[in-house]
């Protein structure tokens, strides 16, 4: 817990109120010191700064020494004396620069599991000649450095610490040098810091950051040391970043532990210390706040902590640049700060607590509305009824519902929503509608935070609602307002995740191909699509449109360099461009090998419930004409997860949505929601595969829908978050993070892989293998239940296991595992066909220069200069390619870009084209 105090010594550095944040335990110990030595005034601002900028253990140890002294001349003097005796210039930079100054000694021949006493303190160091004692004024050199750092704009301070490269601050720079750079423009500042400190680090590319979110990153090593990375710019932001400000949020990645460390009694002790004490960035302290795993799409492929994003937030600072500006969380504990986002303490379990609190991490675009002017109405969910009109209950005894996740929004608010939003990012420019006549989005996937409640789901346009109105259902409300906190302020906002957008041509998936094959779709259907697609992909080498489309799609791989070359008129047979296009073709073929076949007359549309109640149990609406459609939802595994439904036009829908489109409506009739029948789906933003492909509909024969046969969910019986102390809750939440990040359940991936391996063999068996097929089908149904249960387990904290009797260790060859068998199913045929085409395309192409550039005259001076320059480049690049550092090659490229352009790139360069062109021409002819 962080606390602040009033500075009673108003003459101290001119402060009358100082928000010098101390951990709660340190503040408590300080009060005990005041109680014993009560004839002394409270300590000065500078002394509080010193206490706030060190670890909790060291601060408590120092104050205990003071408490145990019989007589004290001055509190400030004795505290400073003890601190100077314990902390060195190199002892603190571990917290300042993000890198441990020393490696603690280990006993030769032994793997030490338990930290020694010297290791426990985050900013202590063994005695050494490097101690710098305090001067006459009681300030040591490192405090002077940190104060200078604290005068910088945070973006500049963070960049400087990033460029330190593991060195301690005092080794490489002085406070006067830092102050000299303080007022430089960012580009000039970066250049000065780079040449002074960072030539061994990856260089920052200072692109235009207007409107972009700054992600400040920190990587923590198993020994507890950490290094800063970034900042990185993205077009998308989170509710957390928008409320606190980008620089008050630190994205933290904890590295995997060495295998030998996992056998220790407490292998994550260093990480727990970080969570408890926080991370110091200069004079700022950041503490653990929230984490989020990669979501359903990432769970199957997760094999490291990279997908588990952990966020620390700023809880205190003694930097002068921060103390001049108010901070929204000043004086709050972590527990209080979370309550201002949502009343998450009301939830039943710590697992549910963190799962729901992570809603603030969704990538969103803020809807610019005054939340106090919006009427939020709660309406009932639409229950599923049997033929006697009684509620139908699920396996847990709760009513089944048709409307899971869907509410309504008034037309005026919908018109304020941007169009074409996907995961918080605008897919097209100039998409803010305002009062334009264009139709508003039909469906808006949202996160709404209002008076302590948290709402997740979609809003369907409803033209019948009064202005400034939204309607939410209980199925959408993930966190309810705590009625005991009626006067407690909250960070209210309506955030847009995704809108219903014009659909692109859909692709199949491995699971869908397997299920369609099981349902009677012949192999020739898939192979015809594959062969036609392979032929079209080859046009990438001789059709500018095809090449440009591919270069744009994969533009993030090369900063759109290939696209710029194509747009500049560079011939497609230019060696580098041709080589790069061949890489893109391989990526496209890899998609095909994985079963991602493009299919005509098929789309992915966001699903919702029919507001009119007119659709029958086997009908959907949203397509222009009445016809049968095939409906599926990824990542469905059950034979009945593919439905054949009748697409029907409902005239009365226009009263609700007008001409808005790009969604699919499911009925609100029947004993069970159609969405739930399709791989346990709902209507909070799920995308459904809709196909009216005539050949698919001709051949596919549907199966009975999925019904869970697993037992009812276990009810959590542990202590609720509200029953835990703040300290206990923080410890419990970080345990959940460690379990999620470092011991992730492999059940999801193993169940899916085992299902596919069994399904592959099932598809190749003839009708004569009745018993074997029946046994295999039984296993697949069991795996399906396990898979669906495991996907939802993190919300409840339920543990799901994979029994050995359904676990597979021999896989079809296209899954590319260690132990494989040769598959002859449709998926094996697809894989082999693409491999055969890859073998045909391996003929190497010669390297030649473009005649137009060879014919132009080049000065001898430029040629000689570029020869030397290129020689140095080749030498450094060879060294980088032979190193173990993945970033080394990119660092060399960035270095030489900087030398060529005198900037991070062409766009940022102030050099005119006439100055760059002769050098570029010489360089082209040298190589």
Swiss-Prot record:
Keywords: Nucleotidyltransferase, RNA-binding, RNA-directed RNA polymerase, RNA-mediated gene silencing, Transferase. It is an enzyme of class 2 (transferase). GO terms for biological process: regulatory ncRNA-mediated gene silencing. Coiled coil: none annotated. PANTHER family: RNA-DEPENDENT RNA POLYMERASE, RNA-DEPENDENT RNA POLYMERASE 3-RELATED. InterPro entries: RNA-dep_RNA_pol_euk-typ (IPR007855). The keyword Transferase applies. It catalyses: RNA(n) + a ribonucleoside 5'-triphosphate = RNA(n+1) + diphosphate. Residues 98-135 are annotated as: Disordered. GO terms for molecular function: RNA binding; RNA-directed RNA polymerase activity. Probably involved in the RNA silencing pathway and required for the generation of small interfering RNAs (siRNAs). This is Probable RNA-dependent RNA polymerase 4. Residues 121-135 have a biased composition (Basic and acidic residues). It comes from the Eukaryota. Its EC number is 2.7.7.48.
């Amino acid at each position: 817990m962080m606390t602040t105090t009033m500075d009673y010594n108003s003459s101290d550095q001119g402060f009358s109120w100082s928000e010098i944040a101390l951990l709660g335990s340190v503040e408590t110990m300080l009060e005990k010191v005041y109680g014993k030595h009560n004839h002394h005034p409270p300590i000065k601002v500078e002394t509080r700064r010193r206490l706030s900028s060190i670890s909790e253990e060291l601060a408590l140890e120092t104050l205990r020494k003071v408490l145990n002294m019989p007589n004290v001349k001055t509190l400030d003097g004795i505290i400073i004396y003890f601190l100077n005796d314990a902390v060195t210039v190199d002892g603190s930079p571990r917290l300042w620069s993000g890198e441990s100054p020393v490696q603690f000694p280990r006993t030769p021949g032994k793997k030490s599991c338990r930290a020694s006493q010297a290791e426990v303190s985050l900013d202590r160091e063994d005695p050494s000649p490097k101690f710098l004692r305090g001067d006459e004024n009681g300030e040591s050199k490192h405090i002077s450095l940190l104060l200078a750092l604290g005068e910088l704009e945070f973006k500049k301070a963070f960049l400087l610490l990033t460029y330190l490269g593991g060195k301690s601050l005092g080794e490489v720079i002085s406070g006067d040098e830092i102050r000299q750079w303080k007022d430089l423009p960012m580009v000039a500042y970066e250049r000065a810091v780079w040449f002074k400190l960072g030539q061994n680090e990856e260089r920052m590319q200072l692109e235009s950051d207007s409107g972009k979110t700054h992600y400040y990153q920190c990587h923590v090593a198993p020994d507890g040391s950490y290094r800063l990375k970034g900042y990185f710019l993205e077009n998308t932001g989170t509710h957390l970043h928008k409320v606190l400000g980008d620089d008050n949020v630190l994205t933290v990645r904890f590295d995997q532990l060495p295998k030998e460390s996992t056998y220790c009694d407490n292998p994550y002790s260093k990480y727990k210390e970080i969570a408890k004490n926080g991370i110091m960035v200069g004079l700022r302290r950041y503490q653990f706040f929230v984490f989020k795993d990669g979501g359903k799409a990432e769970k199957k492929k997760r094999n490291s902590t990279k997908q588990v994003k952990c966020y620390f937030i700023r809880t205190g600072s003694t930097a002068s640049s921060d103390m001049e500006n108010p901070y929204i969380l000043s004086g709050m504990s972590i527990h209080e700060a979370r309550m201002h986002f949502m009343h998450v303490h009301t939830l039943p379990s710590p697992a549910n607590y963190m799962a729901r609190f992570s809603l603030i991490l969704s990538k969103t675009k803020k809807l610019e509305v005054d939340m106090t002017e919006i009427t939020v109405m709660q309406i009932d969910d639409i229950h599923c009824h049997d033929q006697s009109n009684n509620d139908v209950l699920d396996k847990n005894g709760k009513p089944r519902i048709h409307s899971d996740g869907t509410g309504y929004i008034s037309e005026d608010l919908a018109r304020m929503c941007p169009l074409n939003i996907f995961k918080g990012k605008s897919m097209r420019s100039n998409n803010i509608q305002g009062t334009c006549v264009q139709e508003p989005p039909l469906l808006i996937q949202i996160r709404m935070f209002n008076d302590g409640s948290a709402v997740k789901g979609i809003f369907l346009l409803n033209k019948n609602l009064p202005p400034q109105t939204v309607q939410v259902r209980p199925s959408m409300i993930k966190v309810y307002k705590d009625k005991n906190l009626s006067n407690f302020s909250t960070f209210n906002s309506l955030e847009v995740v995704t809108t219903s957008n014009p659909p692109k041509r859909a692709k199949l998936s491995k699971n869908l191909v397997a299920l369609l094959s099981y349902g009677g779709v012949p192999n020739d259907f898939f192979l015809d699509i594959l062969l036609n697609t392979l032929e079209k992909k080859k046009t990438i080498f001789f059709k500018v449109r095809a090449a440009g489309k591919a270069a744009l799609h994969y533009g993030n791989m090369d900063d759109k360099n290939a696209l710029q070359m194509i747009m500049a008129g560079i011939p497609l047979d230019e060696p580098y461009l041709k080589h790069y296009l061949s890489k893109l073709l391989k990526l496209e073929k890899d998609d095909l090998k994985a079963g991602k076949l493009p299919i005509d007359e098929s789309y992915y549309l966001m699903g919702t419930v029919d507001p009119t109640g007119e659709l029958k149990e086997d009908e959907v609406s949203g397509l222009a004409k009445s016809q049968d459609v095939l409906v599926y939802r990824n990542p469905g595994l059950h034979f009945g997860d593919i439905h054949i439904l009748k697409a029907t036009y409902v005239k009365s829908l226009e009263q609700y949505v007008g001409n808005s489109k790009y969604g699919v409506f499911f009925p609100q009739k029947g004993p069970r929601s159609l969405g739930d029948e399709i791989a346990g789906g709902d209507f909070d933003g799920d995308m459904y595969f809709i196909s009216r492909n005539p050949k698919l509909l001709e051949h596919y024969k549907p199966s009975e829908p999925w019904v869970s046969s697993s037992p009812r969910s276990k009810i959590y019986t542990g202590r609720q978050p509200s029953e835990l102390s703040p300290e206990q809750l923080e410890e419990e939440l970080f345990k959940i993070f460690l379990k999620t990040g470092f011991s992730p359940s492999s059940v999801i991936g193993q169940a899916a892989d085992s299902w596919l391996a069994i399904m592959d063999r099932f598809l190749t068996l003839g009708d004569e293998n009745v018993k074997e097929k029946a046994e295999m089908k039984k296993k697949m149904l069991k795996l399906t239940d396990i898979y669906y249960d495991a996907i939802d387990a993190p919300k409840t904290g339920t543990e799901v296991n994979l029994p050995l009797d359904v676990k597979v260790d021999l896989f079809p060859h296209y899954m590319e595992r260690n132990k494989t068998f040769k598959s002859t199913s449709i998926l094996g045929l697809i894989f082999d066909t693409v491999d055969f085409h890859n073998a045909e395309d391996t003929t190497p192409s010669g390297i030649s220069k473009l005649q137009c550039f060879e014919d132009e005259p080049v000065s001898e001076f430029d040629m000689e200069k570029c020869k030397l320059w290129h020689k140095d480049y080749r030498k450094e690049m060879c060294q980088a390619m032979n190193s173990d550092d993945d970033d080394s090659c990119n660092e060399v490229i960035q270095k030489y870009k900087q030398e060529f352009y005198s900037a991070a790139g062409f766009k940022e360069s102030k050099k005119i084209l006439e100055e760059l062109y002769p050098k570029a021409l010489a360089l082209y002819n040298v190589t």
